[in-house]
């Protein structure tokens, strides 16, 4: 690694330790040329797949868009931010686990529905009504009946 002080190419690691609950490595380095010390942090780069929209267009995964959609469904519901963040982390983990470079947005939508169903049934119905484009009360009733018949999968 280049020294940020003198630009020399040769630095040595004098200490390494895990930080951020094991998600990051902190390294103390020393420049062989000038003797200055500095700290670097390493994290794994975890790339999420691109999304294939229903119209065939492709776009990068947008965590903020996902969070906003789930927050909208959970608005004024008794679900903590921690539980929402855990659900988001679970969705991202499942997407990475597919090993695919691209996934259909429908797959992500179904993952969101499954997570919302575990978090809060009212939020699930709110999201489902928009996601599945309910047209009338009968479609709401059918989804509520399905919710009552089929327990949420953990």
Swiss-Prot record:
Does the keyword Nucleotide-binding belong to this entry? yes
Job description of the protein: Negatively regulates transcription of bacterial ribonucleotide reductase nrd genes and operons by binding to NrdR-boxes.
Note how many cofactor molecules are bound and how. Binds 1 zinc ion.
Q: Please name the HAMAP family in this protein's record.
A: NrdR
Q: Is Nucleotide-binding a UniProt keyword of this protein? A: yes
Bilayer-crossing residues are none
Q: Which cofactor does it need?
A: Zn(2+)
One Pfam family of this protein, by short name?
A: ATP-cone
Keyword set, alphabetical order? ATP-binding, DNA-binding, Metal-binding, Nucleotide-binding, Repressor, Transcription, Transcription regulation, Zinc, Zinc-finger
This protein's superkingdom?
Answer: Bacteria
Ranges for domain ATP-cone come to 49-139
What are this entry's molecular-function GO terms? ATP binding; DNA binding; zinc ion binding
Organism of derivation: Pseudomonas putida (strain GB-1)
Q: Which InterPro entries does the entry mention?
A: ATP-cone_dom, NrdR-like_N, RNR_NrdR-like
Q: Name one GO biological process term.
A: negative regulation of DNA-templated transcription
Concerning its family, UniProt says: Belongs to the NrdR family.
For this entry, the protein name equals Transcriptional repressor NrdR
The record places its unnamed zinc fingers at: 3-34
């Amino acid at each position: 690694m280049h020294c940020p002080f003198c630009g020399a190419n040769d630095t040595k690691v004098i200490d390494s330790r895990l930080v951020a609950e094991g998600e990051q490595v902190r390294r103390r380095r020393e420049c062989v040329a000038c003797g200055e010390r500095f700290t670097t942090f390493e994290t794994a780069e975890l790339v999420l797949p691109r999304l294939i929209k229903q119209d065939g267009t492709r776009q990068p995964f947008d965590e903020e868009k996902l969070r906003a959609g789930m927050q909208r469904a959970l608005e004024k519901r008794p679900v903590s931010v921690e539980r929402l963040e855990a659900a988001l982390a679970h969705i991202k983990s499942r997407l990475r686990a597919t090993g695919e470079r691209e996934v259909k947005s429908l797959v992500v939508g179904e993952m969101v529905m499954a997570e919302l169903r575990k978090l809060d049934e009212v939020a699930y119905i709110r999201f489902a009504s928009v996601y599945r484009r309910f047209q009338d009360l009968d479609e709401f009733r059918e989804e509520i009946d399905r919710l009552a018949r089929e327990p949420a999968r953990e």
